[in-house]
Amino acid sequence: MNDQTPDRYVTFLGLDCDAKADRLMDMLAVRIQEDDSRWVGYFRQKLAEKERMATDNLHFVGSQINSLYSYFEELEDADALDLLWHLEHNCC
């Protein structure tokens, strides 16, 4: 295997998944403050559950991947969608 791409099935080292999940969660937090989409109530509920269960941001992203895609697609947020795609394919 001569490819220098990190292999997530061997190690998550070098992928910086936690920091990228944190960044996506920051993007989500900003968006739900600015928006009145039907998704806002959904994500507020899920974020409250996340706090009660004390799960990390990467776990939340992995658990909510389809909902996050739908929400960021609705907003046409290309940066969030790109980051979400990266997280899904490299970290989850």
From Swiss-Prot:
InterPro entries: CowN. Keywords: Nitrogen fixation. GO terms for biological process: nitrogen fixation. Pfam families: CowN. Is required to sustain N(2)-dependent growth in the presence of low levels of carbon monoxide (CO). Probably acts by protecting the N(2) fixation ability of the nitrogenase complex, which is inactivated in the presence of CO. HAMAP family: CowN. Belongs to the CowN family. This is N(2)-fixation sustaining protein CowN. The gene is cowN.
